[in-house]
Amino acid sequence: MERITTTIPQADIDRQLSFCREIAQINAARPQQPLAFVDTYGCQQNEADSERIRGYLRQMGYGFTDQEEEAQIIVLNTCAIREHAEQRVLGNLGALVHVKRRHPDQIICVCGCMAQEQHVADKIKQSFRHVDLVFGPHVLWKFPEFIHTLLTSR
């Protein structure tokens, strides 16, 4: 899948950073540091995007875990190119329904180029109602705003 370069105006970048600061303040008031789990499927670009996501999460005050059960935020960064990636992601989403039942405040996000494909996004939204957020790489820069909206609407 071809990547498109977008120039983000400084005012929009500043707005996203303000969301990071607000979330960091919310998280600083918690008795324990909240944790995030980021799982990457696919190519080197996905690895780079996952690092950006981890950077945002760090700015928001999250630590990291390799256990989905411990995480307040789970991010699955998907790939539409690699063989069997779609089946693996959908299988893992099915398993996460049990985790979400035990931790209903947990935020589950699916992003990446697979999530950008309309038929896949529709399938996730219809079949995996425990998923809170589905977005493609073209709006990755708005991740702090998406998380802020989810946190403040609960």
Per-region residue spans from a language model:
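Cofactor-cradling patches in redox/metallo enzymes
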Residues: 1-146
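The C-terminal output helix
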Residues: 148-154
